[in-house]
Swiss-Prot record:
It comes from Drosophila ananassae (Fruit fly). Pfam families: Sdh5 (PF03937). Plays an essential role in the assembly of succinate dehydrogenase (SDH), an enzyme complex (also referred to as respiratory complex II) that is a component of both the tricarboxylic acid (TCA) cycle and the mitochondrial electron transport chain, and which couples the oxidation of succinate to fumarate with the reduction of ubiquinone (coenzyme Q) to ubiquinol. Required for flavinylation (covalent attachment of FAD) of the flavoprotein subunit of the SDH catalytic dimer. Interacts with the flavoprotein subunit within the SDH catalytic dimer. Its main location: mitochondrion. This is Succinate dehydrogenase assembly factor 2-A, mitochondrial.
Amino acid sequence: MLRQFLVSTAVRRVVVPSMAQTRCASNLDKSEYTTPGEIVDYDDPPHIPVPEYPSRPDEPLETRKQRLLYQSRKRGMLENDLLLSTFVAKYLKSFTADQTAQYDDLINGVSNDWDIFYWATETKPTPPEFDTEIMRLLKEHVKNAEKVQRIRQPDL
């Protein structure tokens, strides 16, 4: 039994280090870890139905603003949670009814949150139907000319 243990230990000393050299990420060429030059973003197949967001024409303005505040904080994607919650904390209170409707259409009319992120960061061009006053304001907010740290959502 001791002899078998010693043989297996000797084999481990010979085999395992040679395997570890090929599998260890620190031994690989660093050029393999470059950032891709373009974003891989496939269109959704046409057979996947995307439900329409129901419009709420009779919703009072203050109720709509409260709903948008909540929806801006709970996107399911941290990047948009941070961008939209800080945007709403800064601008939503001063929005008119028309601006509030534009913002509602922006965050609820798009079926993919990555689209909002790419448009706001100007990684992809914004479609004309979403290129509104509010989207331009959001793009300016994302540029962060004031250099404000946005590492967490603002308090309610």
